[in-house]
């Protein structure tokens, strides 16, 4: 189990660095003479047609609806494993990161709404600062090497996974529109068949993959966001087969490199290209921008810390062995690195809004996430010992 966690953390760390490169490249292209080529490439129409089935979308939406469904499939597999056998498999293990994650979602949303109370049309973005980017956060933490206690990394990992689960619920409840009953019925039948396969002990991934594709198309056409299909598929794939092997973990290990080194960097490259042409210092004072920055930079750490502190004081949870509040505080700041998931929610929230809203959101996400990364890194570096020695609680 410890080796699996270390492998996961090392991949996520490398992914965080690759994400930064993808963001930088997108920003350079969006603000260069090649900006038109960059935008035109993302707007390229891509069509999939089989009989009466016709899916015709710009490349950007194929990335956001298709590739990100695979990313959410991976998140679903991780959540299921952690719930059944890992860091969230008991009340004692799950209490602190679960309670901390709730605070880390509630407070950023409140901060955002506080800055957008006078503009109802922008309030739809309340969930944007509620997310934590697991790859970026672990990537920043990894820069400190073995100075970081494994228990602290696992705490951040568990908190971020629960955070992702919360984001999935938010997307399902608040960002699904114009529902098609026919598509929902097809989706329901697909789910029932996958559950039946699970109950029958079918461990081959192929039938789940075929039914999963049907589910993805049905959800895509239903008005519910297509990425949720990935999570549903994950929860239907058995964790343990009759012969003791784990189809779920096998698929998770297969997907991890693709997610880390292809899916998330491609998503970042496609969504982070913020043109600064029309941006001024006044852009930072826009309610959307300010709400997101304050939500990520203040709302996240305040929520995580306050709820963690109350949970410990009320004896609902305990700090991990060898970990003190001086460690938790900078990690709470790092939770404000919301990049990938925040950009994704922003693309849903402002899908039918003026383009400027999306630009302000990306400006807020990039600024807030960068500041959270820098402050969290230097703060954690200051409280950790110079070498990977024994960590004492203070």
Curated annotation (Swiss-Prot):
It comes from the Bacteria. GO terms for molecular function: sodium:proton antiporter activity. It is found in: Cell inner membrane. One of its GO terms (cellular component) is plasma membrane. It catalyses: Na(+)(in) + 2 H(+)(out) = Na(+)(out) + 2 H(+)(in). The chain crosses the membrane at residues 17-37, 59-79, 95-115, 124-144, 154-174, 177-197, 213-233, 261-281, 287-307, 328-348, 363-383. Gene3D superfamilies: Na+/H+ antiporter like domain. Keywords: Antiport, Cell inner membrane, Cell membrane, Ion transport, Membrane, Sodium, Sodium transport, Transmembrane, Transmembrane helix, Transport. It is a multi-pass membrane protein. InterPro entries: Na/H_antiporter_dom_sf, NhaA. GO terms for biological process: regulation of pH. Belongs to the NhaA Na(+)/H(+) (TC 2.A.33) antiporter family. Na(+)/H(+) antiporter that extrudes sodium in exchange for external protons. This is Na(+)/H(+) antiporter NhaA. The gene is nhaA.
């Amino acid at each position: 189990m410890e080796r699996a966690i270390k492998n996961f953390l090392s991949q996520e760390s490398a992914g965080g660095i690759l994400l930064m490169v993808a963001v930088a490249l997108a920003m350079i292209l969006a603000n260069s003479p090649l900006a038109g080529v960059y935008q035109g490439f993302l707007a390229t129409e891509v069509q999939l047609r089989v009989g009466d089935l016709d899916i015709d979308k710009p490349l950007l939406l194929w990335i956001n609806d298709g590739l990100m469904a695979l990313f959410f499939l991976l998140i679903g597999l991780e959540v299921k494993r952690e719930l059944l056998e890992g860091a969230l498999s008991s009340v004692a293990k799950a209490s602190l990161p679960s309670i901390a994650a709730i605070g880390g979602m509630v407070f950023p949303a409140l901060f955002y709404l506080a800055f957008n109370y006078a503009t109802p049309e922008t309030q739809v973005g309340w969930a944007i600062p509620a997310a934590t980017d697991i790859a970026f956060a672990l990537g920043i933490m990894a820069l400190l090497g073995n100075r970081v206690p494994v228990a602290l990394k696992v705490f951040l990992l568990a908190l971020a996974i629960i955070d992702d689960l919360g984001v999935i619920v938010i997307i399902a409840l608040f960002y699904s529109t114009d529902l098609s009953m026919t598509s929902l019925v097809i989706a329901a039948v697909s789910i029932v068949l996958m559950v039946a396969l699970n109950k029958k002990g079918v461990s081959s991934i192929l039938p789940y993959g075929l039914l999963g594709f049907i589910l993805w198309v049905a959800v895509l056409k239903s008005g519910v966001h297509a990425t949720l299909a990935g999570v549903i598929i994950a929860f239907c794939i058995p964790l343990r087969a009759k012969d003791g092997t784990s189809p779920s973990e096998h698929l998770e290990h297969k997907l991890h490199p693709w997610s880390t080194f292809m899916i998330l960097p491609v998503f970042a490259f496609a969504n982070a290209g913020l043109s600064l042409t029309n941006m001024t210092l006044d852009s930072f004072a826009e309610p959307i921008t300010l709400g997101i920055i304050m939500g990520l930079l203040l709302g996240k750490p305040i929520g995580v810390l306050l709820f963690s502190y109350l949970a410990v004081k009320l004896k609902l949870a305990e700090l991990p062995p060898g970990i003190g509040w001086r460690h938790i505080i900078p990690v709470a700041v790092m939770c404000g690195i919301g990049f990938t998931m925040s950009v994704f929610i922003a693309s849903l929230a402002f899908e039918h809004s003026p383009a400027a809203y999306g630009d302000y959101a990306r400006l807020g996400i990039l600024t807030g996430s960068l500041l959270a990364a820098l402050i969290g890194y230097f703060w954690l570096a200051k409280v950790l010992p110079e070498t990977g020695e024994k960590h004492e609680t203070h």
